[in-house]
Amino acid sequence: MKTAVNGLGLIGGSIAKELNRQASPFEVYGIDSSELHVSKAIELGLVRSTLSLDEAINRCTQMILAVPADKIQALAIDVLDRIGAHHIVFDVGSTKDEICKTVAAHTMRHRFVAAHPLADTEFSGPEATHLNLFRGK
């Protein structure tokens, strides 16, 4: 299953790490505005490589939006405007009210899952990823 993680910090990177640990054949790709985060995520084996948003939509069936909460609304609409019926988009931001209101009337709303892993630490970035961050969540 080809998955793109958009945002390779603590939460997105930890999700990528967990997906890579699974027995099923996940192919995890990364998107991040920070070249440092991208190169570190590749070096740590969190993602196979980086993709542009267009490449991720064309290549992957799952997209995880792990960018800062204030950027998720615009990104969610941009992604939902461009996906097909075979895609699923997850948001793992810390707030839900405005995000859910923003996507509520979108024609691809049924392909969007608003989620929160209820996990965090005081650290950030790909080096802060934690394999067991979501255990028991």
Give the location of each predicted region.
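Short, well-ordered alpha-helix to beta-strand connector turns
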Residues: 47, 60, 86, 136-137
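Conserved short alpha-helix immediately C-terminal to the canonical SAM/SAH-binding motif I
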Residues: 36-37, 71, 96-99
